Amino acid sequence: GHRRIVFIGGGQNSRTLALRQAGYCRAMEQHGLTPIIDTAQKETVDMGPWCREATLKLFRNAAPPDAILAYSDVTAMQILDAAVELGLEAPRDFSIIGFDNTDFGRLPYIALTSVSQQKFRTGRLAVQRLLEKIGGDCRQTTDILQPELIIRSSCRKI
């Protein structure tokens, strides 16, 4: 299976980034693997140039990754684009998973495996909780929705 799995993420001040990194580290450690994290060192609106450089650096390394977990589908697509510069392609040379299950990731020529956050269910639940509050229900609730892995063809079968 994959042994050198890298997490490539966004800006350093994001709560979402911190939670995704923590989940990645926990999963890696549970499987006896060393977490490898590469995140931007500053906040930026356009992650493209940073992501490109990080990707080129990782794949030029003596021990390049055999799999990448990207912070988002957009990050994953930027990684895929940069890998092409080196003649690399997923899933032939490495596996990649995004996060968000965006419409672009579903396109057949990208076919990005992605983690779905079930945005529709999240939105519906948020409206339901808001209506309950408006109706006088002041209980504090915590709802946890399980993400779903949407398997497409950006990961090698192992």
Residue ranges of predicted features:
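Bacterial carbohydrate/catabolite-sensing allosteric modules
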Residues: G1-I158
